[in-house]
């Protein structure tokens, strides 16, 4: 009972309509730069690229997959650092250097025999709009560009790279009644 109260307090700001849309979701897809990261790119003197990721975002991926969700990324930039992170998280799929994300998503859904209504997508910028306006549940981080925030179903209070992916995952699990049992089962294992 205590866990339920904690989860309810944690997600109390999420509108009920968002939870209703989340009930039909089977796939969580994210952009990377500006969602899994804060959008910054660091380079060293040799041109090596560095990005900072939030470990809380990564931790939930395997639990989503165990709960039956597919998890993936479609990103506009091609970057070995991003590919490495997607592999490390064991995403079911990840596409890099994609300029037409809606076309790529449509091709992907056709092979998976899924519909747009079964997709939750996290994006933060202009390149994400064609997807965000057509999927079953669209989510943006707090620091997404204003016209993206205006177009999505839910704007998280969290910024890119600060746990927005984790919140979206928790939201999906909670909408399907799986977050509280997950927390309680893990708490019992550690007791």
Language-model regions: role of each:
Residues 61-85, 95, 132:
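Substrate-recognition element of Asp-dependent hydrolases with the DxDx(T/V) motif
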């Amino acid at each position: 009972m205590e866990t339920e109260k904690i989860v309810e307090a944690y997600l109390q700001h999420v509108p009920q309509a968002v939870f209703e849309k989340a009930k039909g979701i089977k796939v969580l897809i994210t952009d990377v730069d500006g969602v899994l990261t804060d959008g910054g790119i660091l380079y060293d003197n040799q041109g090596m690229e560095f990005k900072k990721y939030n470990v809380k975002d990564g931790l939930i991926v395997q639990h989503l997959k165990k709960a039956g969700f597919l998890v993936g990324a479609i990103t506009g930039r091609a970057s070995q650092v991003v590919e490495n992170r997607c592999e490390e998280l064991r995403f079911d799929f990840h596409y890099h250097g994609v300029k037409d994300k809606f076309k790529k998503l449509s091709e992907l859904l056709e092979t998976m025999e899924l519909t747009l209504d079964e997709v939750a997508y996290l994006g933060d910028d202009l390149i994400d709009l064609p997807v965000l306006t057509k999927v079953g549940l669209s989510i943006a981080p707090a620091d997404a560009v204003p016209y993206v925030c205006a177009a999505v179903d839910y704007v998280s209070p969290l910024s890119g790279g600060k746990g927005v992916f984790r919140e979206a995952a928790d939201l999906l699990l909670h909408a399907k009644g799986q977050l509280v049992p997950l927390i309680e089962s893990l708490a019992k294992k550690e007791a």
